[in-house]
């Protein structure tokens, strides 16, 4: 299995996703957007990962690589490749598919409950049954958040998840393109790096937890790792179906 990653931050270790890739000994290639905007042809990889970032999707003037990255992601989706977008990555998928990305009413930072949208699942049985997303994602789980923007659910996609602070937490498109507002990659070291680099965001807020609250949740780190491994196994199956 060949995995290509769009990385926006120098210190992004890929967290639990990186651990899963290492354990599987799969080939991993990267486009480091902060250094260059070289993109491979879609046929050169099986799965695309679009990671998070401190920038916003609509800051094309500040980040010259954003427009070509969006064009690349659109090309990959059109080619039918499986795609996983985390936080900023999910927002990118939404915009590429015609959705809008705007400021969320609240900043959401820390561990928060994510709930599945049962009525959407009931109304779209073929889309979701065929996709067979990990059962640990239903009916709810605890996800790690660090965001101030939010995405629309794009046309043709099915809304999957919501949280108290953010109505749109996840969607699936074409059965193999998954956009998640939370960070499935969040393990302890990944979170420590984020706090070190962006700790200034940890101000008083209704949905903003303190460093102590975030790092003191050992069970959440464990359950997040299990969810991420199940999710990556799901993508592994999807890639096998494509090949």
Walk through the language-model features, giving the residues of each.
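Conserved beta-strand segments of alpha/beta enzyme cores
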Residues: 27-29, 100, 142, 158
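A short acidic, often aromatic-flanked loop/helix-cap motif at beta-alpha or helix-coil junctions
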Residues: 35-39, 109-111, 151-152, 167-168
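Glycine-rich, phosphate-binding/catalytic loops in enzymes
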Residues: 20-23, 64-68, 101-102, 161-162, ...
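Cysteine-nucleophile active-site neighborhood
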Residues: 50-121, 142
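N-terminal beta1-alpha1 cap of cysteine-dependent amidohydrolase-like domains
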Residues: 1-81, 203-243
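Short glycine-/acidic-enriched loop or helix-start segments at secondary-structure transitions
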Residues: 14-16, 59-61, 94-96, 155, ...
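Amide-donor transfer/coupling interface in amidating biosynthetic enzymes
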Residues: 117-243
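Conserved beta-strand termini and adjacent loop/short-helix elements that scaffold enzyme active sites
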Residues: 6, 31-33, 104, 146, ...
């Amino acid at each position: 299995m060949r995995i290509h990653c769009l990385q926006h931050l120098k210190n992004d270790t890929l967290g639990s996703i990186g651990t899963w890739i290492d354990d599987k000994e799969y080939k991993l290639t990267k486009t480091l957007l902060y250094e260059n905007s070289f993109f491979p042809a879609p046929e050169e990889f099986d799965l695309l990962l679009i990671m998070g970032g401190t920038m916003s999707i609509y800051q094309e003037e500040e980040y010259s690589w954003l427009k070509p990255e969006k064009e690349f992601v659109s090309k990959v989706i059109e080619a039918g490749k499986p795609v996983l977008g985390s936080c900023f990555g999910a927002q990118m998928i939404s915009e590429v598919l015609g959705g809008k990305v705007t400021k969320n009413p609240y900043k959401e930072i820390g561990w928060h409950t994510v709930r599945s949208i049962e009525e959407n699942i009931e109304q779209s049985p073929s889309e979701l049954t065929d996709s067979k997303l990990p059962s640990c994602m239903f009916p709810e789980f605890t996800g790690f958040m660090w965001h101030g923007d939010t995405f629309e659910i794009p046309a043709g996609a099915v809304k999957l998840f919501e949280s108290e602070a953010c109505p749109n937490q996840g969607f699936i498109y074409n059965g193999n393109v998954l956009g998640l507002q939370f960070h499935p990659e969040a393990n302890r070291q990944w979170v420590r790096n984020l706090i070190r680099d962006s700790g200034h965001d940890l101000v008083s807020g209704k949905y903003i937890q303190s460093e102590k609250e975030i790092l003191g949740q050992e069970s959440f780190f464990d359950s997040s790792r299990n969810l991420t491994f199940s999710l990556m196994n799901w993508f592994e199956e999807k890639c096998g179906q494509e090949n």
